[in-house]
Amino acid sequence: KITEVNVADTLKEVRRALLDADVNFKIAKDFTAKVKEKAIGQDVLTTLQPGQLLVKLVKDELTELMGGDVAGINLSGNPSVILMSGLQGSGKTTFSGKLANYLQTKKNKKVLLVACDIYRPAAIQQLYVVGDSIAVEVYSEPENKNPVEIAQNAIKHAKSNGFNVVIVDTAGRLAVDEEMMNEIERVHKAIQPQETLFVVDSMTGQDAVNTAKTFNDRLNFDGVILTKLDGDTRGGAALSIKTVVNKPIKF
């Protein structure tokens, strides 16, 4: 049987591995406690060591936590409006282009990219460069400093020009601040998107949890996008965010 004694070391290793992978401390602690609760008292097959069975239980628990089903993008509207949210530098603009390309090539949609970041220098130009590289039209109003108006006008433009999907790229900030949250809330309320996505840099580590929670409390987003997984990240942010906000990781 599995007992506290014969799996104590393995559980310690599991917790250390989670912390090394940037999983939030409390979540790592709760996770191992849950695995331990399920494991204690289980019969071990003669061919297995208690530690080996525990590894299987850890894998099962991770699968259950992350959700076995693939969550797609909601494209029900006409046009379908997708709102991007997240901190500055998380990769919203680049991902907006990747999503537009995916919807255009794989789903046969006519996509409009909308530049609503009126603060960051060259944000609008960046979206144009991205749009040009994938042959997707970009809507912007460089003189207009009201992102709500820009987004609303873009949707009107999309309706009258036969676009199926509108992807709204919004401004990020270096940290969560009230002004930024109020602005994206106003945009969200005005355009009523079918899909609100929270884009997070997977290398953010522990802090990703607090940011995700703040955005989710204000926008009740539909899914998470993890960027920069090709860096030196260990992906712990995925586990932490999924646990805290219980929203699917879509890409």
Identify the residue ranges that each predicted region occupies:
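Primarily NTPase-proximal linker/entry elements flanking Walker-type ATP/GTP-binding cores
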Residues: 1-116, 123-144, 150-170
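Residue-level detector of functional hotspots within protein domains
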Residues: 9, 73, 124, 182, ...
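Low-complexity, compositionally biased segments
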Residues: 9-12, 25, 120, 204, ...
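Short, small-residue-enriched loops and turns at beta-alpha junctions
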Residues: 89-90, 119-121, 145-147, 172-176, ...
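Glycine-rich, phosphate-binding/catalytic loops in enzymes
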Residues: 101, 129-130, 182-186, 214
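Conserved phosphate-handling catalytic cores of large alpha/beta enzymes
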Residues: 152-155, 163, 175, 184-189, ...
